[in-house]
Every structure is written in structure tokens, then in C-alpha cells.
Amino acid sequence: MKRPQRLAEGDLAAVLSAGGHAFVSSCSAESQVLAAEVAGAGDALGDRIFSGIFIAGLNRQVCAAGANGRTVTFFQTPELKAQGQRNRFLPLCYGDSVRWYAANPPDAVLLMVSPPDDTGMCSFG
């Protein structure tokens, strides 16, 4: 198992390859810091897809980088709808979204956790 990697500001483009698929912590665990890092990485991330459980009225950040970045969402938000073709809306219930992730596994997961302990374990709070 790969150990968690702590990122400093501006490191995202160096650790995420262009293209691919990243799950982004969202819903009530949205990180404005991560969304800003994705936006700041810009075109260096190519046509990378960012997916998550984005909720209207709660998640106002658009997690897409550069001109070719795309988002997949299971709940449509006004901010994502405004992205037009860059946003793929899949109106699935939670159970079906789990199956979608099983069929479309991300190659990266972006979330905030506590620093790892001596064994490399992290906590969500």
C-alpha cells in the first residue's frame, strides 16, 4: 500500500499526471484549498477528470483544471451546470454511484486528513 503523500501549495501538478481520474472530497468535506490547487494546476493536468458527490447550495467550487479539465457529478449544481460540456452529470442514486466508481476507479484521491502517525495511518478528524 502506498503511503499517504503530504502536498505543499503548488505541488499538485507534480504528483498528478495529465489525464486520468481523481476523486475529490466534496459534499460536507469539501476542501476549498484542494479546489484552489486544482484550479492553480491549470493545463498541466490536461484532460483529467475530477469526480465527487457535489451538492447544490453546499459545494460552490468547480473542481476542474485548465481548458480541458472535466468534472463528473451525481448531483447537478448551478456552478457545474454552467461548465456545459466540461461537466458530465450522471443522475445516479448513492448505490449506483458506488457501482460507477467500481467500474471507473480513480487513479488518485484528493482529501484532507490528519498527519500520518508512526505507522502511516491517517484520520478524517
Predicted regions: what is each one?
Residues 1-125:
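Conserved alpha/beta enzyme-core scaffold
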